[in-house]
Amino acid sequence: QFQAMLDIHTIVPFRVIRALAPSWREAAKKEAEAGDEVHRKIVNITSISGTMGNSGQANYSAAKAGVTGLTKTVAKEWGALKVNCNAVAFGYIETRLTASKDEANVMEIDGEKVQLGIPDQLRGMAAMLIPLGRPGTPEEAAGGVFFLCSPWSNYVHGQTLNITGGQ
């Protein structure tokens, strides 16, 4: 399971970025020759688990830490091409993975049914650790990604934006 977590959260973003490289480099060279400045955006998705760790999730935390390193490296390598590479690190966001375990979906992985969600007692404790007092919404999480994709973030580069409610 450790390798699967690395593959999903670290290797896949690397491969997507690598696939973009030829076309984005060529376009950037043409724009530079024409005197145009066009910013392209890469927004990787990570988690505060990648910087803070999370008990019982060494695989996930390691994979998300890898995304942060990938983001910073791509930012350094592609900055001259006007490719802004940033990441968003989510804290506790309400999703089916963080729903109450009693109400959560069941997912099948390799033929085994896995119940998703967090026990209510842990959900309550997690909310107490957030200074804003509640988990974030999917819309609030999307706002950070939207900002990093917008022209307002053209000078934001190689950064990880924490969407955590203050965790």
Each model region followed by its residue ranges:
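A glycine/serine/threonine-rich, flexible loop-to-helix segment
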Residues: 80, 92-129
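Active-site "substrate specificity/gating" loop of NAD(P)-dependent dehydrogenases
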Residues: 53-57, 79-80
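Active-site helix of classical SDR
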Residues: 17, 63, 71
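Short, small/polar-rich loop/turn modules that mediate ligand/substrate recognition or access, typified
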Residues: 79, 84, 156-158
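Substrate-binding pocket helix/loop in short-chain dehydrogenase/reductase
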Residues: 1-3, 126
